[in-house]
Amino acid sequence: QKFLCSMEDRIDVIPVDYCADALLMLLNQPLAHGEVVHISAGEENSVKFAEIDRAMAQALEQAPVGDKYAQVSYDTLVKMRRELKGIFGPCNERLMLKAMRLYGAFATLNVRFSNDKLLSMGMPKPPRFTDYIDRCVETTRGLSIPQQMAVDFK
């Protein structure tokens, strides 16, 4: 119920299969050396953390965090270090804090990348994270944070 970003901040997230499809499409495009093409959700399909909260709650069949959420500093999270196992289950507290610091720093940037060039090349719009978050919840159900991190940080 606490993290570094605001619930109104947005995040630019795409599914890995969309990224793979875009990369395959780009292999057949005549791009100039050094030309940049962002594979991203873009402004239109990025989502607010408040939207993620509601979609996660629906997927988990529980109430959203909503008004109970508090935007806090990293120092506050460090002070909560001993509570992390109660929140996330068995985990390495130090590694969790490091991950929260890295992800939190990115999330607070509230960055969205322009995918206009990619879309103009014929790539369809990506799905919004909230459109497939239920699949993410289902495929990670029963996995601890360390088990998920083992896959994420290979």
What spans do the regions from the language model cover?
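Short aromatic/basic micro-patch
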Residues: 13, 46, 112
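Substrate-positioning beta->alpha
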Residues: 6-27
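A hydrophobic C-terminal alpha-helical subdomain
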Residues: 1-6, 75-124
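Glycine/proline-rich active-site loop of Rossmann-fold NAD(P)-dependent oxidoreductases
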Residues: 26-37
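Amphipathic terminal alpha-helices
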Residues: 55, 66, 70-72, 101-154
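Glycine-rich Rossmann NAD(P)(H)-binding loop
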Residues: 4-9, 37-47, 52, 56-57, ...
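Short, flexible loop/turn elements at secondary-structure junctions
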Residues: 15-18, 40-45, 117
